[in-house]
A protein has these predicted regions:
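ABC ATPase nucleotide-binding domain helical subdomain, centered on the C-loop/LSGGQ "ABC signature"
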Residues: 1-39, 83-84, 92
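Hydrophobic anchor residue at the start of the ABC signature
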Residues: 54, 98
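Conserved D-loop/post-Walker B switch-helix segment of ABC ATPase nucleotide-binding domains
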Residues: 72-85
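A residue-level structural signal marking coil residues immediately N-terminal to beta-strands
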Residues: 62-63, 93
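C-terminal portion of ABC ATPase nucleotide-binding domains
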Residues: 20, 28, 84, 92, ...
Length: 151
């Protein structure tokens, strides 16, 4: 986290790690925040590594965050919670989120659904989660597919 914010306090670090879904995990480490993970953090899971990178991004002063699949390597329920918490917790900056977890987008201000036409990407639908459920067959279908695969 100090890579992104050199003067970060322990309290700020814990808050960011909590936002990234790692609060309980850090508390269980032998030395808490002072635990050395080693080069490349190879001793931790892919999901934990991904969430550490997310906490680092949250520590940065950037006014816009571009997050590509922040819930990757997590089970569906944890991914949904993580994305929802991110969207609700950070009002100081814009978050552009690329995800296949449509169910996690209920609290997003705006959702842009992309599709392919003749090998080119295009916008299929745009609006809030609830608007798209009501007006976009593609969005409703994709969400139903996601929910059935989660069961």
């Amino acid at each position: 986290l100090r890579v992104a914010k050199g003067d970060i306090t322990a309290e700020q670090a814990y808050e960011l790690l909590e936002q990234a879904g790692l609060g309980a995990w850090v508390s269980q480490l032998p030395k808490g925040l002072d635990t050395v993970l080693g080069s490349g953090a190879t001793s931790i899971s892919g999901g934990e590594r991904r969430r550490l990178l997310l906490a680092r991004a949250l520590a940065s002063p950037a006014r816009i965050l571009l997050l590509d699949e922040p819930g990757e390597h997590l089970d569906p329920a944890t991914a949904d919670t993580l994305i929802t918490d991110l969207l609700q917790a950070d009002s100081k900056r814009a978050i552009v989120l690329v995800t296949h977890r449509l169910s996690a987008l209920a609290s997003a201000d705006e959702v842009v659904l992309l599709g392919k036409e003749n090998q080119s990407a295009r916008i299929i639908a745009r609006g809030s989660h609830s608007q798209l459920l009501a007006t976009s067959n593609e969005y409703a279908w994709a969400l139903a597919q996601e929910e059935s695969s989660d069961e």
